[in-house]
Amino acid sequence: MREAKDGVLISVHVSPGSKEVSFSYDEWRRAVEVRIKSPAKEGKANRELLGIFRQIFGEVELVSGEKSRSKVLKGKRE
């Protein structure tokens, strides 16, 4: 995690198609490791990922990595 002008940036590594949703921290990648159920097709995995993070943090957007397993999310300050 690192601070941004109007929020916080979160580095995430996503593993789609998992049996259950889980979180861990990957020290080597310096990223939150997230396993999600949705497949990486037609944006389904991105929608599930954003939905999970929005439940936890509120307003969240995908900054980079739309078609990659390595993503950067931005949590906005209120």
Swiss-Prot record:
InterPro entries: DUF167, YggU-like_sf
SMART domains in the cross-refs: DUF167 (SM01152)
Domain of life according to the entry: Archaea
Any GO CC annotation of this UniProt entry: cytoplasm
Gene3D superfamilies on file: YggU-like
Similarity remark: Belongs to the UPF0235 family.
Protein name: UPF0235 protein AF_2072
